[in-house]
């Protein structure tokens, strides 16, 4: 289940804080029901991304990237430090994929390659 922000993009979306999603996972009670942690959305709603990832790692099954503000490239024009975030994700033991989910304002293939380089820690 993917958490989205209700502040900018998805007004009135129910799952807009990680803790809400974690509580839902506990209620469902299945090891097959987990969270998709969208770093862009959760930065907007709650910040403290690295601490949240570490705290709730057992409930997260997948990650999405995206620059903030604007959900554009993950480069030095936005506020998230993706090398540090990805190192924290790796330190949790996560072995899955990191989805590059952003809206490029430059050449899409160049932006995607840049995203891979930034996240290759």
Q: Where are the model-predicted features located?
A:
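Short beta-strand segments at enzyme active-site cores
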Residues: 1-3, 99
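Conserved beta-strand edge residues that scaffold enzyme active sites
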Residues: 4-6, 103
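Histidine-acidic metal/acid-base catalytic patches
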Residues: 15-121
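Active-site-proximal beta-strand/loop segments in catalytic clefts of secreted hydrolases
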Residues: 3-4, 66
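Surface-exposed cleft-lining segments at the edges of enzyme active sites
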Residues: 6-13
